[in-house]
Amino acid sequence: MDNQSSYDSMMGFMAREETRTRTVTSPRTGTPEGRTLTGPATRAWTMRLLVLGIVLTALNLRPAITSLGALLEEVRDGLGMSGSVAGLLTSVPPLCFAVFGVTAPRLARRFGPGTVVCAGMAAITAGLLIRPYTGSTAGFLAASALALMGIAVSNVLMPVIVKRWFPDRVGSMTGLYSMALALGTASAAAVTVPMTEVLGGSWQTGLAVWAGLAAAAVLPWIPFVRDRGAAPADSGQEQHARVDAPPLRITRSRTSWALAVYFGLQATGAYITMGWMAQIFRDAGVHAGTAGLLLAVTMVMGVPLAFVIPRLAGRLPHQGPIVLALGACGLAGYAGLYLAPAAGSWAWAVLLGVSNCSFPLALTMVGMRARTSAGVAQLSGFAQSTGYLLSIPGPLLVGVLYQHSGGWGLPIALMAGLMIPQMAVGVLAGRDRTVEDEAAR
């Protein structure tokens, strides 16, 4: 299913719901957790705008990273970076996601999720526009951190928004969001190099142009900015956007820890892939444009699969079999990169693309492992922040191993080795239970 048909299908669902009035009741408190939606025209407009905001937000959550991966060699030469510093650069995304992502639930309680996501999109716009023209490695890192801060809070709040606005369509909406995220990731990887050549060959221009897409994503969230997390019960527009944290000790839950480690290991593999895979192919003799296209193939595999996997996962009581299947594809892809990186490059790109769909699976499990949207907010913040913190050393270590070994054998062996514990904790995270029950015990 392509992106347009998926969007049309979701719009059809919204249209069928226009004449209904629904209140979502919290199992924890017994009180309405969502808003009672009245006024078919207002509801239809709000829901369509929200879906547009979710899709545009998802499109902007990876181009800041994959566009840099496609031009990493040019950026290194232009700023005089060593291999170790470049490895540090590829570790900045998970570091920012860990540091800033943990603040997202608190910010959402105070200002409302819509306000925070709108500010996040503005931060991405500013960071992408500034970073190519700072003229130094330190400035480049600082501007990248600004953009990644916006990505971090939006990463955490997307499952919360899906759970609150679409509690009976978590799998479908997560699939739509994940599919748009994969599309943005793949597009940046595929078109950054040729677009840079068309625009005159300057890597600065090739990176800065992605600020335009981020600016477009600010607009749908502006109507949701007026909520400050304290709307009266009859306000109708944003009552349910407030995220009240439950009295839940999330660290008592084994599932929350398993999900956090799974999130961290899949993020490690994903950011190593986005930051280094194009360089692996280039070092194997593949042309720079083709290497970027191969990275795009890896990313674009997530477009259809990111829609299918969450829906399939939502229908299964245990997501372990999906975890194992994705892990097996990753192991096969790494083996191919090690043995014949250039000869079978397209096959390895496809296999690693399938394996990278662990990300939408992890997001789906976040939505399924908690009963309430407040629980999802806390679980999402914990799993993503802890997971991204765990993923920080991976890309940096790959850069160090590459520089000191003079080849890709050791880095690829590291990537393959990390896939084994990822599969193990993924099976644990996929068990049919909730963090509320585990924390209570």
Model-derived features: positions:
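Juxtamembrane intracellular "pre-TM" segments in multi-pass secondary transporters
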Residues: 34-43, 226-259
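Extracytoplasmic gate region of multi-pass secondary transporters
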Residues: 68-69, 254-297, 303-304
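Helix-breaking motifs and short loop linkers at transmembrane-helix boundaries and internal kinks
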Residues: 80, 112, 133-138, 167, ...
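Conserved MFS/SLC helix-loop-helix module at the cytosolic interface between two early adjacent transmembrane helices
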Residues: 99-138
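A late C-terminal transmembrane helix in Major Facilitator Superfamily
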Residues: 370-408, 415
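Cytoplasmic helix-loop-helix junction between adjacent transmembrane helices
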Residues: 143-181
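Helix-loop-helix hairpin linking two adjacent transmembrane segments in secondary transporters
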Residues: 168-169, 176-229
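C-terminal transmembrane helical hairpin of 12-TM major facilitator-type secondary transporters
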Residues: 319-362
